[in-house]
Amino acid sequence: MMQRNASLKNIIDESAVKLESCYRELRAVMPEYFFTAFSENEICAMLPFLTLLKPDGIPLQTEIGRKIFRFYLRAENGSVLRGADGGKFAELPFTGAVIHESCKPFTPAGNGQFLVVESFTVTPLPKEAPVFTFAEIAKYFTDRSGQAPAGAEELYPRLNWEQLSDLTVDRLAERIEMTLEIQGESRAAVRIVPLGENRFKMLVAAPNAFAGSSYFTRIVEEFRLSNFHIERAYWREFSKALPKEDLDHATVDFGSFYFTGEAEKMAGFERAVKALYWTADDDLFYRELTVRRRWNPADVNFLRAGAEFIHSQFSFVDRSAYNYEDIARFIVLYPEICAELLELFRSRFDPDRDGPLTGEEPLRERIAAINSGVAERDNLSRNIFRALLNFTDSILKTNFFVVDKGALAFRLDPAFMKFYEEISPEYGKAFPADRPYGIFFFFRRNAAGFQVRFSEIARGGWRTVVPRIGTHDLERGDYFEAARDEFFREVYVLAHTQHSKNKDIFEGGSKMITLLRTEGTGDWHSELWEAQKAVFAAFLSLINFDADGTLRDARIIDRLGVREIVEIGPDENMFDNMISYMGRQGIRAGYTLGSGIISGKPESGINHKEYGVTSFGVHEYFLRTMKELDIDPFKDDFSVKISGGPFGDVAGNLMKLLLRKENGNFCYPAMRIVAVTDGPAALFDPDGIDRDELSKLVLRENLDKFDPRRLRGEGAFIIFSAPCREGDEEYYRQVIRKEGKCVENKLSRDDFMRLFQSNLHRCADIFLPCGGRPSTVNIDNWRLFANGEGRGCRAIVEGANSFLTPAARIELQKSGILDVKDASANKCGVITSSYEILSGLMLDEEEFRSEKAVLVPQVMEKLAFNARREAEWLFATRSVTGEFLTDLTDRLSRSINAKNVQIGEYLERHPEVVSDELLLDHLPGIFRTKYRDRLKRLPAEYRKAIASVELAGRIIYNSANGLENEIALALKK
């Protein structure tokens, strides 16, 4: 027993000697700041692991308190966070990270081995009291520069003191400044400071939308690829966010890196670190060009963007041959051609580049010479690189060389489309014949988009398409790829439709669509807002001009040379907080229209959903269509089916109008809404959906909140889109009324989808599509919507944009169904937005708020006038000519738009025709009675455009009234 105790004592003594020796060595080789970064308890807990380290051994890992620690040895030519060992930390949602490397070799491990200690904070640390009061921080700022920066006092209570106890006041102040710079943006701020003898300090501030920890590991990997040596690094959650809906005050992560490197590489390294914040690091471009060939990730983004763009076009040439994966593969197989293409692009748009433009001919010859021995493959490769060259030639301006950004934006000449038409005639058939006035293209990690407009001054909504968020991981990619193949056609067709419906206002038509691939984390709103903020900032940089017509950002070379004024409206997945944010950013940037860059602002605009302006117009066309069907909705029995749910803007507000009561009674007493089909649920009731129950949901809840106990008719049912689980079984819930009782059923996914889709086919007098994806009714399925056994309708009023394809419209009208096209039926939303923007330009914000109660009813009067005037013209003309209603909508739009162009050209030569009286006729009455002097606030381009569209409408509607109007005009003479 005594011998065993003696042996144990010897072991303990030997261990104590080892630990003490290790501690002394640690003191000798680690920088002093190491002992500030880690507590005494943490350092003591490290020592046993440090004694076990071996050269070329695997990293040792342990958990100490709330942190994960890793210890390993690095040879002089090794790297931190090495290889696959560090890869797993990219997915670890840590709130703090520290890397420390010894200044000298760690002697216990042998010669040439440096000790690396890493720690990752993975659970919240105990709250700590602030190290400095705000008064102390403010005094530092005052002593240094006169005053504390704006926003510092608001930021102070959000500082994450648990992570900041080691900072001195000067370091804290520096980080506060950088945090204030970027907490409302989707980009990183980077500062590199020389410390002498090729030593540098880099500070990085980055909004942590949902993946800040992975940004840290990407930066560390870029150090390795650049052959820079990290001595120590820190990553911490510097400040907490306000609620995630607050887009101006995000959580900000902060990184500090102390390293050695070559001074001449610093500018490129800074570009790379900034780009990595919003750049993919898991794709073929990163692996082949950044990792393998050491290309700067900022430069590689040009090729990524180009690949995304040409894929969006080749989708209408041959989707199978030109799938995205093959496009990317063929591009990276020819890095020399990629380098020449990038050089050509630089020669045109890099403001720091001197010398002549690079010629295209050598590049064209190199592309033509591609020859792998496989003819079909080579033909694809040549077309891909010719398409990339076409993309480059089409660029008129870009923010690519802007220092601080979170996305790329390109203004393109729409003539690029000719290239694809020459490859295949099928391409041209995919789009309306009219070609756009201008196209913008946007790109960043997991997001791409277009803005298409058909006139110089144009407006239209910004839609973000987020394919099937809640689906299985194995299917989510399929839905994304399907949307990816179609989204250029979607934005094109919607913009073209918008141009048709904008005939009553001075702006032509446009549309903006962003396609977003979500990470599947569940917090898709944060991903949505991060992408929208980045794309908006990139877009704004290309349309933000000084008073003299020069772009404000001097790093953008403008080969177009024309001031562009663009307006945006809200659309799918555009929430009030983002609308308000964009308005504020428009003011901060000094944009021509200020907050008028977007309409529908809840605090200083005419919010479409609040006032139901789009649905107001749809309802006017509904009433006129019912008259044509010889149905008096105020007394006759009739049935309705609707796509879109009670919480949606158009569907919800239309339900509000259809379900309204006067003196306690329904205005349409015998109306039956037999079917409603919405994303969260589908509802059918042959006796008519319970109107009181449906009314409870309108503009408050989605359709899945409908109480199944309120089902009425035999066979009535509701199905729910959210899948249910019991063990390994997944099913969909149905409640159906059978023999007077509600019965629960479990449906397979296929049965659910069959019922969901067929709910749109139910028999009703009138179909009101007010929500759903474009091309839902198409040439392949139109017969299911035509009249037949238990299905169909007598008329359609299109509240949703492009819900029917042109071919489907023709076939349905041939079958005898009346169809009021979207460009007529839902135009009142955009008319409202136009008046909102004009009112915002002419009134101060407080005036707008105070006059809103008067202004909105006057706008509604304008909406009623425009909707009724067109509806009467459509049905009157149809009764005479027999033309389809949709063709008449197109004819009217083309006539007014063509006349508008002619008048605009005339007004260029005769500006005296643009009178105040003409402008006031177009505007709500309050501007004639109270604010006539504000007309001078309108940009000259707007004055001419307003006069032009006002005259065009008068001329076309008057001339379209035929012989009766001609006689009336003759009698006046």
For the regions a language model picked out, list residue spans one by one.
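Non-catalytic interaction/regulatory segments
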Residues: 2-437, 442-451, 464-484, 527, ...
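Low-complexity, serine/threonine/proline-enriched polar segments
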Residues: 138, 142, 147, 157, ...
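Gly-rich Lys/Arg/Thr-decorated short loops/hinges at beta-loop-alpha junctions or inter-strand turns
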Residues: 198, 460-474, 593-607, 727-740, ...
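Glycine/serine-rich phosphate-binding loop and adjoining beta1-alpha1 elements at the start
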Residues: 283, 491-638, 665, 677
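Conserved phosphate/anionic-ligand binding catalytic regions in large, soluble enzymes, centered on
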Residues: 298-302, 412-416, 434-462, 500-524, ...
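Extended, regular secondary-structure scaffolds
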Residues: 331-383, 390, 610-643, 647-725, ...
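Alpha-helix capping and helix-loop boundary segments enriched in small/acidic/polar residues
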Residues: 475-482, 501, 505, 522-530, ...
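Non-transmembrane, aqueous-exposed alpha-helical and coiled segments at domain scale
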Residues: 493, 623-641, 663-671, 685-699, ...
